[in-house]
Amino acid sequence: MKQIQLIKPGGLENISVCDADVPMPKSDEVLIKVAASSLNYHDLLVALGAIPTEDKRVPLSDAAGEIIEVGSDVTEWKVGDHVMSVCFPNWQSGPPKYELLSFIGDHEDGYATECIAIKASAITRTPSNFDLKESATLPCVGL
């Protein structure tokens, strides 16, 4: 599959399209075929190096797609479900705590990829009246 990697943070010239293996979801993960992604200011800051990240990071925090595989322990999702990313995947409820406010695309690989394996709790269902392209624009701005 193809994915975009930030070979080294510090400039847009360091973004490259690369080949990668399709990931295998762990027992608590789902495999999503990414249909659409959207860009936001966070993604630019990561690429420019203003938000620290590792070399070869797959950027982008906002996307929508279809589940194509579910891990053995996942019960809340099924193949074919339309889902989108969430802005803070580790913050499930309650007052925000600093350690829970990491973004996909800076502390872990993001959605600039054809397929992503991600924790089942790190996604949400797309609105029924939005297509996948429209849904991909919601995670950050919809918060």
List where the protein language model places each region:
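A short beta-to-alpha transition loop/helix N-cap that caps and shapes the active-site region
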Residues: H42, N90-P95
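Short N-terminal binding/cap micro-motifs at the start of the first secondary-structure element
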Residues: G10-I15, Y41-D43
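Glycine-rich beta-strand-centered segment in the early N-terminal region that forms part
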Residues: D21-S37, A47-Q92, H107-G110, A122, ...
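Short beta-strand or tight-loop elements
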Residues: E13-C18, A63
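A glycine-rich, Thr/Ser-enriched phosphate-binding loop motif common to dinucleotide/cofactor-binding enzymes
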Residues: H107-Y111, F130-L143
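A short glycine-rich beta-alpha junction/loop motif
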Residues: C115-I123
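Extreme N-terminal starter segment of soluble prokaryotic enzymes
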Residues: M1-K2
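Short, compositionally biased
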Residues: P95-D109
